[in-house]
A protein has these predicted regions:
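Phosphate-binding beta-alpha-beta segment of Rossmann-like dinucleotide-binding domains, i.e.
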Residues: 86-88, 94-142, 150, 154-157, ...
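An N-terminal-biased, well-structured beta-alpha scaffold segment characteristic
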Residues: 1-91, 188-191, 211-213, 217
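Short, Asp-centered acidic motifs that coordinate Mg2+ and/or phosphate
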Residues: 44-45, 67, 195, 223, ...
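Short glycine-/small-residue-rich Rossmann-like dinucleotide-binding loops
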Residues: 30, 51, 73, 194, ...
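Rossmann-like dinucleotide/phosphate-binding beta-alpha-beta segment
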Residues: 131-220
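Rossmann-like dinucleotide-binding domain for NAD(H)/NADP(H)
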Residues: 90, 212, 221-306
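Residue-level detector of alpha-helix initiation sites
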Residues: 53, 74-77, 96-97, 142, ...
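Structural/interface elements that position substrates and couple domains in central-metabolism enzymes
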Residues: 2-5, 13, 22-27, 95-100, ...
């Protein structure tokens, strides 16, 4: 049997799959970085979510580590290059939470154009701002997707159902059967769109993929939505673009600094035309079960082959 430690929680159904497989001796419970390094001895499979940072020194401490399972999409919390050098396999679940993130994206978009958060907070403060909260329809508008993987495709399905024109930039996608116009470069797509929605992982290629240069290219009054990773969007440039009214409004589920309590993020969140959620894109009951089960099945498959 292999020793498996779940440093972050998985859905009960996923844990049962791992237990019933008969190939793992399982422990669970969150260790911080220093505790994790001390307790990795003998652990061959390590399961994490976004709360655990698997850095090079953590990996080096895991002398028996064979497999890292990242239950979720992003691998920015795992030093994949260091793992590769040490011969440690790394797996994630890229499509499992796509529906959850796509639904939140559409919710953020509609909340933004119809002023739902402001309407709610106003009513709670006994304000009746009916005349002030004139919004816009998304029907007939053009949405530009940066990233057209599993999540981007799910967003496209929903945007098309709302009657939007959908454009997408993804250098790794050359064709699609969907009614989506693919672009080979951002510079050509951005001037065409009324709103931009980011759906890319955070890596060296995508760090600040939207910054001042890109904001200069979008239509005046464009909308920005980020439910991907905070680092893919230059938040200082976003703040400046909103202040200059180049960007009309933004909806953010993720931040380069989380929790977003530093000066820049507080200024950004203090703007009336910025709405935000605390990185809850994948936080649905169904999404968590799907992520956990997919991760469990993958680890069982790998364990049987080792």
């Amino acid at each position: 049997m292999y020793r498996l430690h779940a440093n972050d929680p998985l859905a009960d159904d996923a844990m049962k799959l791992l237990e019933d497989s008969g190939i793992f001796e399982i422990s669970k419970g969150h260790y911080d970085k220093d505790e994790l390094k001390k307790n990795l001895g003998g652990i061959e499979f390590l399961v994490v979510r976004s709360a655990t940072k698997v850095t090079a020194d953590v990996l080096s401490a895991g002398k028996d580590l064979k497999v890292i399972g990242r239950a979720g999409v992003g691998l920015d919390n795992v030093d994949v290059d260091a793992a590769k050098k040490l011969g440690i396999q790394v797996y994630n679940t890229p499509g499992a939470n796509a529906i959850s993130v796509a639904e939140l994206t559409m919710g953020l978009l509609i909340s933004l154009v119809r002023h739902i958060p402001r309407g709610t907070s106003g009513l709670k403060d006994s304000l009746w701002e009916k005349k002030k909260l004139k919004g816009n329809e998304i029907f007939g508008k053009t949405l530009g997707l940066i990233g057209f993987g599993a999540i981007g495709k799910e967003v496209a399905k929903r945007a098309l159902a709302f009657g939007m024109r959908v454009l997408a930039y993804d250098p790794y996608v050359k064709n699609t059967k969907m009614d989506v116009e693919l672009y080979s470069d951002l510079e050509s797509m951005l001037p065409e769109v009324d709103g931009v929605s980011l759906h890319v992982p955070l890596n060296n290629e995508t760090k600040h993929i939207i910054s001042k240069k890109e904001f200069d290219l979008v239509k005046d009054g464009a909308l920005i939505i980020n439910a991907a990773r905070g680092g893919v969007l230059d938040e200082q440039a976003l703040y400046d673009a909103i202040i200059s009214e180049k960007v009309k409004a933004a909806a953010l589920d993720v931040f380069e600094v989380e929790p977003p309590n530093d000066e820049l993020r507080r200024k950004l969140l203090g703007l009336d035309n910025v709405i935000a959620t605390p990185h809850i894109g994948a936080s649905t009951v169904e999404g968590q079960v799907r992520v956990g089960i997919e991760m469990a099945k993958k680890l069982i498959e790998v364990g049987k082959k080792l």
